[in-house]
């Protein structure tokens, strides 16, 4: 009787957490099972005026100690260099940053000659988007298939399994998006538009959808000829 009652109470507690605190439930689930669920935390600063360059350090810290940047993509940047992550239009503003964490080879890693040569990394994706949005994930974990839900508090963290790979790592972005926008405005970009800005090993690629506006910058913020 006590076992049944305890099980019932645990079940009711889990159900309540799933409704009122899904992120806490997924965190508990991760600790118990070892399966890494998507995590979430608030963005740095005002989500309605989110500056991904100014907030970059918080994204890197969320990715994990030693995380190295692979790329950064900001969708729908306003002329002042910020995104309104609370905007209700679709598709909505979003920042995606890809990182890599160097890790030790897993216990079941193949030997050299069977695909085991190279450095092992875990790829980490940090996304900043509209707070309050709920996500649902179905995946296969160490103990079998799992399904869970989470609520975005401002940015999310998703980590892949270890794998060997080769990356070109980037320094932290230093070109203010407002400065890139100023160059685009001088070249005729509409001031009431929003831009997509991508940062990778070739520099910054500034584009405005729907109109023929594209400006490319090097990593020193200078326009490429």
What function would you assign to each model-found segment?
Residues 3-19:
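Hydrophobic membrane-insertion alpha-helices, especially the h-region
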Residues 1, 175, 221:
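Functionally engaged cysteine thiol sites
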Residues 117-194:
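Long, charged/polar, surface-exposed segments that mediate recognition or autoinhibition
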Residues 61-140, 193-225:
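Exposed beta-strand-loop-beta-strand "reactive/processing" segments of non-cytosolic proteins
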Residues 5, 26, 30, 35-40:
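Intrinsic disorder/low-complexity detector
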Residues 16-29:
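Hydrophobic single-pass membrane-insertion segments
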Residues 6, 37, 158-162:
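A generic structural signal for ordered alpha-helices
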Residues 34-86, 167-195:
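Short, non-transmembrane alpha-helical segments in secretory-pathway proteins
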